[in-house]
A protein has these predicted regions:
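Long, contiguous binding/interaction regions
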Residues: 1-124
């Protein structure tokens, strides 16, 4: 089966929240078929590497299989938190978009939603 290295947003969506200098990002598979690859390959090590440039020091990962989701708790990623950060996005809401774009996974055509623009890449 052909697999392409695609951004995780091709098979999942995400939400971000914050508490102090800690961000949490939930990564949720669109389809049941996308859950196993997210569970297996979206590791805390990969997420830490994506956010290290922002000062992240540790990532904890929690599985929520009934929701087809992972929750990543990213420590020290918000520049001190909403009250002390000088960043434009002090709550870290855009971090979910950053994760969706930067985390690349080997995705097969059958994991994509039927309206995915990435389906064209498999026909090229």
């Amino acid at each position: 089966m052909i697999k392409l290295n695609l951004p995780v947003h091709s098979i999942a969506h995400a939400r971000a929240g914050d508490k102090g200098d800690v961000s949490n990002i939930s990564l949720i598979a669109y389809l049941e078929s996308g859950w196993p690859i997210i569970e297996k390959l979206a590791t805390k090590e990969k997420v830490l590497e994506i956010f290290k440039h922002m000062g992240a020091t540790r990532v904890d990962r929690y599985k929520l299989p009934n929701l087809r989701a992972l929750n990543f708790v990213i420590h020290s990623a918000l520049g001190g938190g909403v009250n002390s950060s000088l960043r434009l996005d002090r709550h870290g809401k855009t971090l979910s978009s950053h994760l969706l774009h930067e985390l690349k996974l080997p995705i097969s055509k059958d994991l994509l939603p039927i309206n995915s623009p990435y389906l064209k890449k498999f026909n090229d």
